[in-house]
């Protein structure tokens, strides 16, 4: 599974005229299930995402996770947006291949599992809508962006 995470001041996702998720300071995570991914891979990726230290401590060092963005136990928001294009194979030609991505039904199942697990472990979780044409708006903080990937 893959997550492209961005530290944000705020972010939201819309489907048409409807806002499906919105956060203040925290992490926007674009999430993709690959062929062969399992719940174990989703759990491993979620643990990494929730524990990844990308927020600055009092000394200005990236040393705090999304669960403690202010150093006093204050949790930041987590906006999870499905994005199968992260699994694209771009090694040949001028058109990406999406063969490495999980099939849509499996991708939806794993994304839903990931979201449910995140909601059990983090107090502020918002989402996009799997398979929808979404408009994502964000204000990067830094910018700070990381590619997280775990293998099944």
Swiss-Prot record:
Sorted UniProt keywords: Cytoplasm, Hydrolase, RNA-binding, tRNA-binding
Function: An aminoacyl-tRNA editing enzyme that deacylates mischarged D-aminoacyl-tRNAs. Also deacylates mischarged glycyl-tRNA(Ala), protecting cells against glycine mischarging by AlaRS. Acts via tRNA-based rather than protein-based catalysis; rejects L-amino acids rather than detecting D-amino acids in the active site. By recycling D-aminoacyl-tRNA to D-amino acids and free tRNA molecules, this enzyme counteracts the toxicity associated with the formation of D-aminoacyl-tRNA entities in vivo and helps enforce protein L-homochirality.
Annotated Pfam families: Tyr_Deacylase
InterPro entries xrefs: Daa-tRNA_deacyls_DTD, DTD-like_sf
Localisation: Cytoplasm
Protein name: D-aminoacyl-tRNA deacylase
Keyword Metal-binding attached: no
UniProt free text on domains: A Gly-cisPro motif from one monomer fits into the active site of the other monomer to allow specific chiral rejection of L-amino acids.
Motif segment (Gly-cisPro motif, important for rejection of L-amino acids): 142-143
Reactions catalysed: glycyl-tRNA(Ala) + H2O = tRNA(Ala) + glycine + H(+); a D-aminoacyl-tRNA + H2O = a tRNA + a D-alpha-amino acid + H(+)
Molecular function GO labels: D-tyrosyl-tRNA(Tyr) deacylase activity; Gly-tRNA(Ala) deacylase activity; Ser(Gly)-tRNA(Ala) hydrolase activity; tRNA binding
Main location: cytoplasm
Lineage: Bacteria, Pseudomonadati, Pseudomonadota, Betaproteobacteria, Burkholderiales
Enzyme Commission number(s) from the entry: 3.1.1.96
GO CC terms in record: cytoplasm
Family under the similarity heading: Belongs to the DTD family.
Domain of life: Bacteria
């Amino acid at each position: 599974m893959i997550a492209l995470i961005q530290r944000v001041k705020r972010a939201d996702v819309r489907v048409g005229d409807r806002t499906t998720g919105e956060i203040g300071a925290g992490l926007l995570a674009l999430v993709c299930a690959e062929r062969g991914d399992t719940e174990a891979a989703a759990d491993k990726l979620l643990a990494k995402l929730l524990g990844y230290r990308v927020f600055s401590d009092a000394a200005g060092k990236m040393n705090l996770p999304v669960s403690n963005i202010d150093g006093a136990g204050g949790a930041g928001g987590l906006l999870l947006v499905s994005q199968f294009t992260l699994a694209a194979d771009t090694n040949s030609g001028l058109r990406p291949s999406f063969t490495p991505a999980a099939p849509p039904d499996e991708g939806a199942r794993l994304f839903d599992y990931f979201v449910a697990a995140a909601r059990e472990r983090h107090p502020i979780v918002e989402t996009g809508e799997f398979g929808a044409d979404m408009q994502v708006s964000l204000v990067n903080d830094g910018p700070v962006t990381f590619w997280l990937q775990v293998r099944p």
